[in-house]
Structures are given as C-alpha cells and as structure tokens.
Amino acid sequence: MNNTSTRSFNNWQVRTIIYTMVGYALFYFVRKNFSIAMPGLTAEFGISKVSLGLFLTLHGIIYGLSRFVNGIIADRGSAKVVASVGLMLCAVANIIFGVSDFVANWIVVLAAKMGTTLTFSTVLVYCMGIIWVINGYLQGMGIPPFTKIMTHWIHPDELATKMSVWNMSHSIGAGLVFGLCGWVIMPHLGLDMSANAEVVQTITANLGANASYEDVLNFSQHFGAWRLCFLIPAAFALLGSLGIFTLVKNSPSEVGLPEVVQKKSATVQTAEEKAEYNAFVRRKVFGNRLIWTLGLANFFVYVVRFAALDWGPTMLTESKGLSLAMATTLCIVFEFIGGNIGMVFWGWLTDKFFNSKAHRTCVLCMVGAAVTVATFWAIPAGTAWWIQILPFTLLGFFVYGPQALLGISAANQATNRAAATANGILGIFGYASTLISGVGFGYVAQHYGWNGAYLTILIMAILGAITLMTMWGAKANGYEE
C-alpha cells in the first residue's frame, strides 16, 4: 500500500475496532445485567439459587451452540448484519423479560378462565427461563461475526495485541452494566413499598432466616428495580444495533482497500469452491486437534470466569459479608481494572516474548488464577473490603488473559477463512461450562455452602492449566500450512 492507502487503512482499522468494541460491549449490557438483578428476583419472587443457576446454564449452553451456528453463518455472509440483528433481538428479549411477571400473571388469569389452575411462581420461572434461553441464542450472534471482522482488519502478527485491546469490550460492557444496575438502578430506583406490610413480609420470607433487617428494608424500598435492569440496558442495545449496521464495514475491500492477508475468501459461489472450502474447514477446524484442545481449555477458563462474574454479587454478599453495592464495586474492579489490564498485558506479552504463541501465555495465566482463587478463598468473611479487593482483582487479571487469547489462538490456527467457525467451537465448550458455573454452582452453594463452590473454582483453574500444557509446542498459527 502507498502512504495514502496506509493512512486510510489505519484510520478505518481504528474506527472498526472502536465501533465493534462498543457494539459488543452492548451485547453485555443485555446479558450481564441478569447478575445484578438476581438478588432482586430472589427477594421479590423467592426464586432459588438452583433455579437461577439453571437459567444461567440453559442460557450458556444455548449461547455456545448459537456461537457455533452463527459462526458458520457469519463466515458465509455479512458479519455486520448478523451482529446488528442479533443485538436488536437481544434488546427485545430483555424488554419482554423486564415485564415477565405481568406476562406470567396474564397466563395464570387466562388459564383460570379456561378452567385450569396454574401457580404464579411456577409460571413465572418458566417464562423467565424461556425468555433467557432465547436471549442466549441471540447473544451468540455477537462474537463470531465480530471475530471474523477483526481477522479481516488486523494482520495475524498483530492479532494478539490488537484483539486483546478489542477484548476489553467484554470488561467495559460488563463493568458499565454492573455500575448502571448495581450503583444506580438497584439502590436508587424502583417503588418504595417499605410501608406495605405484605410486601415486607414476602421479602423477609423469600430471603430466609439469615436475611438482615437492612437487606429487607433495601429491597422493599426499591421494589421492582430489577425490571429496570433489563429495560434500560435494552434501550442502549437498540441504539447500538443501528450503529453497527450503519458504521461497521466487514472488510477493507468494502472501502476499496487491500485485504491484510491475501487468502481465498470464505464466500463460495460454485460447487467446486464450496467443496474446496468445506474440505478446508474440515482440515483446519473439525480435524484440527489444537482447536479441540483450545475448546476444552476454554471450558475450564469460563467456569472460573463465570463463577466470579455471574455469581459475584451473590457470592460476595453471602460468603464474604459485603453489601450489594460493595460487591458490585469488586465485580467492576474485577472487570475494569483486573480484566482490562490483564487482556492488554497478556496480549502484549504474547506478541513480544512468546512469538504470538498465545497458548503458552495462557498456561501462566491459569496457574496464576489457581493461586489467586486459593488466596481469596482463605480470606475470612467480614474482612475489610480493601483487603478482599486485591486478590479478586488479580483473579480478573489472570482469567481475562486466556479469555481473550484462546479465541485469538483459535482464529490464528484456523486462519481468517474459518476463524468464526473455530470460535464457534470454542463457544460451545465455553458456554457448556455453565453446566458447572450455572446450575452446578448454584446447587453446590445451596446444599454444601460457598466453601464447596470455591473448591470447584480452584479445581477448574488447575485443570485448565494442565490442558493448555499439552499443546505447549504448537505453532503460533496455521497460515504456513
């Protein structure tokens, strides 16, 4: 490229990274809002940890399968269309979830008119579960197309560093929605029903014998705030879907610039091209041992990550004695400081010292995560927040290294022709992890206490490190083959 083309390319590359970062952060707005709303759902409706964990598990499994399906779709079509439509539909699902209690009540009334008696609480759990599973599928329309777009805009030799910066969108999205819901919505919005004896009695019963007067008062003074945790982020997501569609370009060629790697496109026209492409995908993805090893490692990484992210507000309040606002603060620091610094640092280290061999960096990260989990577990309940915040932040620093780098490694191994498909496989493994981090984690916490839950996280971190060690000698990418 000449100087003019280079300047134009650099400008478009930066714009594309920023636009897609904002877009994917907004996917998190309509996904991780659920974590902050969980205590409110328990307080108002008595939904158990097992049920909440089941929501997370089903959502995660469907999301993983959706990432695989939509990875294939994105590799063969317009990535930005897949992403923009997906974000719009996620917003719609969140709006419906925000009024799901009204939907459940309507179903109960309608059934009664037809001579059938249904229990409101049961119908509500089913309604919420179905809506959140649908949202799980729609969420899978986010990362595969964005991964494809990035592999077209970033050279493989720079992918670890620049994609680590891009992956800050995970932490930015989760951190912002945690702040919006945990600092603004839950503590300040909703209806003040503290003078309503029936509401106070219901909340007291739902929270159980260990509930403090302060907790009961807080939830009764902000009754219904949980629904705004879904409605307000959905409004941002609707605007974001329009932005993705109008601003993002799938590849440099769409704006008259040369591709960063001159390889055949995934887009196929003739039967011969289709056969050649399918053979390529079988060899680089489905028949590639490294992709499956990275997928298994992703399973363990996501258990650790989701245990801290999805259960963080509940786990920190119940096992460490923190208020919901302070637990939210720790989760935000886990994301914003630990996660963002970790992703950028480990991405830079990968390109600088490990010759873009991201899998080697991930071994160090998982060993660090295991040590940090053990340290945090050992801190007694009631310990000052400023002591607890350091190991919890370090956990984010370590776990977000492989969270970002495993997908980069898979994209490099599969090349940009099949990057989204490879990341779809990683998505299946990653979100199959919710079998443990979702309903499994909820069951262990409810029946065996938080010590059992912490032990589960520690074992997963150790297994992740061992899995990654098996591919220590692998090449950095599959372009040379």
Language model: regions and residue ranges:
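C-terminal ends and interior cores of transmembrane alpha-helices
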Residues: M88-S121, V367-A381
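Helix-loop-helix hairpin linking two adjacent transmembrane segments in secondary transporters
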Residues: W166-P252
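Juxtamembrane intracellular "pre-TM" segments in multi-pass secondary transporters
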Residues: N2-N10, E254-T293
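Extracytoplasmic gate region of multi-pass secondary transporters
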Residues: F34-M38, C181, N288-V344, Q403, ...
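Cytoplasmic membrane-interface "Motif A"-like loop-to-helix N-cap segments
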Residues: R76-L87, D351-M366
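Cytoplasmic helix-loop-helix junction between adjacent transmembrane helices
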Residues: I131-S169
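C-terminal transmembrane helical hairpin of 12-TM major facilitator-type secondary transporters
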Residues: S356-L406
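Residue-level signature of mid-helix packing/kink "hotspots" within the transmembrane helices
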Residues: K32, G60-F68, G140, A174-G175, ...
